[in-house]
């Protein structure tokens, strides 16, 4: 069952999330960029669920190691991963932003397509009129033609 409120975000994951090669490459590049061009503040790191700016890159890389090994992440851990990749990809202020293509080797067009796919695949933390949660707890698009 999907979690719609913060009380269940720390529930352990039941099984590892199946990711394709493009999703893995994107997540790896995004989490790695917190060690490179991205420049978070302590406030931002904490808001994303990490300890502070200095430890963010190590904590993000530890999450990647777990993803790469096929370990199941909790909903809270997936929330941190998703927020970290959204910010590092899009923000030119604290993330990779305009340097993304150079640091990741991925085009913006390819990256946004992968990111939107991940946003649909990962656990939802808020409701949406565009999506519903099916019986398996996965996000489905209400109207694919929208």
Task: Show the residue positions of the predicted features.
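Positively charged, low-complexity terminal tracts
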Residues: 2-146
């Amino acid at each position: 069952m999907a979690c719609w409120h913060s009380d269940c975000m720390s529930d352990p994951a039941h099984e590892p999330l199946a990711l394709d090669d493009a999703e893995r490459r994107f997540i790896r590049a995004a989490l790695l960029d917190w060690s490179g061009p991205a420049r978070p503040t302590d406030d931002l790191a904490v808001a994303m669920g990490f300890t502070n700016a200095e430890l963010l890159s190590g904590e993000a890389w530890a999450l990647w190691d777990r993803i790469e090994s096929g370990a199941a992440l909790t909903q809270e851990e997936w929330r941190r991963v998703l927020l970290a990749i959204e910010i590092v990809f899009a923000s030119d202020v604290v993330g990779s932003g305009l340097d993304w293509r150079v640091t990741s080797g991925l085009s913006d067009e390819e990256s946004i397509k992968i990111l939107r796919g991940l946003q649909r695949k990962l656990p939802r933390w808020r409701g949406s009129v565009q999506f519903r949660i099916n019986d398996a707890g996965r996000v489905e698009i209400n109207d694919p033609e929208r």
